[in-house]
């Protein structure tokens, strides 16, 4: 048994599961599968924008004052994960549309070698928003495939209604 640290969230873990399945179907040995999946995890990039910052405030990732000011001014942080898997702020914008545009631009800037990657998007009760993000991204980057899923379990609690998570 081997336990992977996804260093991602939501649909990032889905992509890791798909990579494990791909290795299994290719007949890889256990050690080769572990090595391949670890390299895959290192190559993943996770981005997200949340409609509501309450959960980040409640779990201590955002101070009450910052949360209050951001909510009052309609500031939406563009978030991502570090190579170690911790959450970091990549930028911010006023309003969800601008924050999503900033996230898409960030992904396009960083996503140079994406033709062999899968673009995966998860959303919390906002399928139209997810489809729009996918459409804009696919105009800017070339990927092997893309898909959209609903958030589930703990990811739904963290994303809150309106949250979008993108993993590439």
Question: For the regions a protein language model found, what residue spans apply to each?
Answer:
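Mixed-charge interfacial surface used for oligomerization/domain docking
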Residues: 1-2, 8-168
